[in-house]
Amino acid sequence: MLLSLHQLSVKFGKHLILDRINISIGRGEIVTIVGPNGSGKSTLLKTLIGAIKPVSGCIERAEKLKVGYVPQRLHIDEALPMTVFRFLTLPVQRSKKTISQALVRAGIPGVEKQQLNSLSGGQLQRVLLARALLEEPMLLLLDEATQGLDQRGTVDFYQHIDSFRKETGCAIIMVSHDLHVVMKNTDRVICLNGQICCEGTPEKVSNSPEYKVLFGLDDNDVLGVYRHKAASNQFNGSVLNVG
């Protein structure tokens, strides 16, 4: 295993956002987290990268775990000139070759000299993906990374992510509020609404009564699901107590 959450809870003031979450992520596994707006999906990812401190529970991490993170959006001050190359060398200086390779992996080659504020939403998401891939992550976190992309852009984005996974064996946690889009090779879907409502293969979750009740679906609604081959995993790491 790469990462395990045990009874993890997060509060904002008196408001309980995540309630006793238990999740384990294996090497090479793709996990998709779905849920309505305000269900705690983004909070969960921010907790995993250490941006939010849980009030209780523990996070167990594999030794020397490297995590890459692609946020929903990046707010850029239009008055601040910054090229893609400069952005990708902060805070760590990297060679032109390394930057170029990361952009190719993310499906947006040759934009090193462009200004960040000149990029389209889809282009910026790919640059953010390139930034995450620079870390050579063992675990890649995607927070609604395809939001704003059209269908072709979404498919292409996922293809580049899947190619990176096959190349490196990294695991992926992908967050989405779009109930009808599940990455082709998803091993497991977790339905979240403050608590874990249900989880399992895409086929299992799409037929779960809890899933249908939460999202107001009936039997005529279709979730895109795919056959897949589960990954086998081993764990060697340490426990981080946070509560």
Curated annotation (Swiss-Prot):
Family the UniProt entry places it in: Belongs to the ABC transporter superfamily. Zinc importer (TC 3.A.1.15.5) family.
Organism: Aliivibrio fischeri (strain ATCC 700601 / ES114)
Binding site for ATP: 35-42
GO process annotations (BP): response to zinc ion
Gene name, Swiss-Prot/TrEMBL: znuC2
UniProt subcellular location: Cell inner membrane
Keyword Hydrolase: no
Organism lineage string: Bacteria, Pseudomonadati, Pseudomonadota, Gammaproteobacteria, Vibrionales
Subunit field text: The complex is composed of two ATP-binding proteins (ZnuC), two transmembrane proteins (ZnuB) and a solute-binding protein (ZnuA).
Membrane topology summary: Peripheral membrane protein
Alphabetically ordered keywords of this record: ATP-binding, Cell inner membrane, Cell membrane, Ion transport, Membrane, Nucleotide-binding, Translocase, Transport, Zinc, Zinc transport
Record Gene3D superfamilies: P-loop containing nucleotide triphosphate hydrolases
Enzyme Commission designation: 7.2.2.20
UniProt GO cellular component terms: plasma membrane
Catalysed reactions, semicolon-separated: Zn(2+)(out) + ATP(in) + H2O(in) = Zn(2+)(in) + ADP(in) + phosphate(in) + H(+)(in)
Pfam families in UniProt: ABC_tran
GO molecular function list: ABC-type zinc transporter activity; ATP binding; ATP hydrolysis activity
Function: Part of the ABC transporter complex ZnuABC involved in zinc import. Responsible for energy coupling to the transport system.
Location of the ABC transporter domain: 3-218
Name this protein carries in UniProt: Zinc import ATP-binding protein ZnuC 2
Domain of life: Bacteria
